Amino acid sequence: MSVVQSSCAYCGVGCGVSVSSNKPNWTDVDAADLILVGDNKHPANYGHLCAKGERLLDSLAQPNVLRYPKLRSGMPLDWDKASTLIADTFAKTIAEHGPDSVALYLSGQLLTEDYYVANKFAKGFLKTANVDTNSRLCMSSAVSAMQRAFGEDVVPGCYDDLEQADVIVLVGANTAWTHPVLFQRILAAIKANNAQLVVIDPLSTATAKQADLHLAIKPGADLTLFHGLLGYLADQNRVDHAYIAAHTEGFDTVVLQAQQLSANLADLATQVGVSVTQLTQFYQLVANNKKVLTASCQGVNQSTIGTDATNAMINCHLALGHIGQAGCGFFSLTGQPNAMGGREVGGLATQLACHMGFSQPEQQLLADFWKVDSIADQKGLVAVEMFDALAEGKIKAIWIMGTNPVVSLPNSEKIAQALADCPFVVVSEISPDSDTAKLADVLLPAQGWSEKCGTVTNSERTITRQRGFITAKGQAKPDWWAVSQVAKKMGFDGFEFDDNASIFSEFAALSAKVKQVFPTKVFDLTGLTELSKAQYDALAPTQWPIASATQIGQQNVRVFGLGEFATATGKAQFVTPAVVSVPQQSLPSNTLLLNTGRSRDQWHTMTRTGHIASLRASIPEPVVHLHSSQLSALSLTEGGLVRIEAIQNQIEQYSTETANPDLFTHASFTMARAVVDDDIPTNMALMSMHWSAQFSLTKGVNQALDARVDPISKQPGFKCQPVTLTPVELALQGVVFGQHYSSAHGLCWQVAQTLENGVCHHIGFTDTDDGFAYQATVHSLKWTLTVVGQPLYIQCNMDKGLLKALKVLSHTQVNVALYQMNDFIGKPVDKQLIKQLHQQIKAGNSPLICACTGVTEANINDEINQQFNDQVMSDGLANISFEQALDSTQLLLGCGRQCGSCHSEVKQCAKQSWKDALSYCESYSDIDHQPSVAEDVA
């Protein structure tokens, strides 16, 4: 059996995967012929994968795959005509309006080689730095903070630090869901080392539920919390004065400001929203342990003060002398598989390749290397600015690669309108179905994961080869190839690349040149400059900096450990934040702060995962999580529809330096079902970022968010924007299986859900007559079934006696087993089918808890009850153990024991079942004197 080692296509952990096939010839294999497992030799995951990673092969069966270039009209083109059209249009646009009238918008899904060629094309030959990436939306605040502190965008540590730390502090990071494989490593290390886990997050997330200390701070209080920590460390004389004097600058200024906060811990605790006991406990944990590591993610980055907040964390570790030491320091958790690779090649509009800026010497080096007279001489427009310029008509041609900005950028309606109005839009995609692809004037078929080859760099600076193992069908091409074809047709030299290996060779050579001229730069691929194609193809996972070929394969490499930094003075910089107070907002009566985040089993805008049935099952429709107290306050009902709309002119009260009113542009609204979740703060709502028009009639959450940004990084502040929530009254709602209409009069809610055996659509109508009329024909069979007081209106559409469409409606949410209901499609409609249909409807449905095993809430409830009864019968009520029951349940069902991302949900479900069983027994036995039973489920 032949095996191909590659990397996962999802988060920044950068897991290795092994793909094998029994077929001797890989040129004609498809997903059905393959087996995928974790690569047990890869240093990121050692064989482990999360639920999404385990289903990577399922992602290949896209419902609609783009195989040939085509125009918006649908007319197909060959590559020669498509590339000529793009080249001619870009050239004409630049000739008439200048180089900054064009732009490229890239993605952390691209490989480093794709990124490099795109940046060379734009900054070196088109002479514009209007090249940005969707990494701006997730990583740029951390990038800006590290550049300010260290002089370069460099994560100092590695994953091994998480396994050596005495205290791990996760800030704004639901790592159990966003980086599940890494979180399992963290939990294992905590258990082995008796370490402490601190989670700082306004939400009681799956990660927070497993922490030794959870600080549920106010939104935006991260900066104040860590600035106060710096003052506390100084007050307690815990800072490393010798290190500070020898290796840093700016401490005296920042510490004076910080000590004003730490002077009164009670006031500080009130500001950040925790008890003084919790605040002191956290500060003492940091002060009294030698190995403390702080890792942050989107909860910090996606804020209008994200850069300052990150610098506040770095300040603390600089003061302790932690940077570059084992088990210590600051670590930025990357969201995408190649966000770091894109930054290395200059994928952000604010930098050049190899971590260079726009100084004249850096420009000249790059111009000489690329053999051009000049390159782009100033920073370009970043993501939000780029699409603002598009809306204003300043950018007249844009090429979007591997990303879906109509969904992922804030103020989605404005983005869609800007693209619709733009004279020329090119989109490179694997599917024509994304919201952005539908607005392309030219749509180019790109090779996706499994087809393309190149490299990616993960959160800890490890470069991994992503290898193709399926031959691309149709005319799908690598993104670097498409850019090169256009560049050559525009008359540019330097794009005669034979393959991805030759691109990487050029990139490594540029890195060596930059290191030679600017020796303080940390980024270094000098050791990879002499790789042959065969050596490149066989390259093992390797962590940079790589000064010599002898370092190929190295891991656990830390930088800045000697106190030498990439700043002009060689010293790290303490950064004094512009404002340290927690932002205060006065919210009207029907207003909450909307927080956005991930669903456990989905990825980005769902173009890769939305069609995978097992990953869709846990959350079939858009939902908004609300505290139970808000339902009556806002006149909402659980399971009911909610309209979520942005409040205009609600500017976070930081200061004029950090809040630009011009950036607070008009936004629209979205809709979701209300879900009661008392882990949500009472002033907050939570909705996932994944939904789009591709799957939902009311599109996604960014419909309701405006485009406020961090003033330094220009990263959008997706977290905690004020919104109004109002109920949406549905006359009828339900599910339709089989044939369906994509639009109908009065249809205000429609969500497509992929099942193992087809697709169903969740629907809702504001008018009863419209609901009954939907898909009704003179031959439709209709009747009413009442289940537990709920009337259900059933309609069967038939063709030659076979069921073609099944509609189940009610006045409230319909809860049926979707897979089993869909099995009726295509079967003869007779008395037996109707009897089985009634039985299935009455059986109801149970929520999916574990995507890896398919275990539902009902499965866990049944097994916990069985364990409870068995223990009572064998040991007596006084000696029962919840932990034993939970362990046995997980062992039998497998839930929470594979990727581990559902562990907290499994435990929560089991705990409720256990409590219900105990409550039932109370009338038969006095258990007040049995503290061990109560403690088991506390």
UniProtKB/Swiss-Prot annotation:
One of its GO terms (cellular component) is cytoplasm. Binds 1 [4Fe-4S] cluster. Binds 1 molybdenum-bis(molybdopterin guanine dinucleotide) (Mo-bis-MGD) cofactor per subunit. It is found in: Cytoplasm. It is an enzyme of class 1 (oxidoreductase). Its EC number is 1.7.5.1. It comes from the Bacteria. Pathway: Nitrogen metabolism; nitrate reduction (assimilation). [4Fe-4S] cluster binds at C8, C11, C15, C50. Its cofactor is [4Fe-4S] cluster; Mo-bis(molybdopterin guanine dinucleotide). Belongs to the prokaryotic molybdopterin-containing oxidoreductase family. NasA/NapA/NarB subfamily. Nitrate reductase is a key enzyme involved in the first step of nitrate assimilation in plants, fungi and bacteria. This is Nitrate reductase. It comes from Shewanella frigidimarina (strain NCIMB 400).
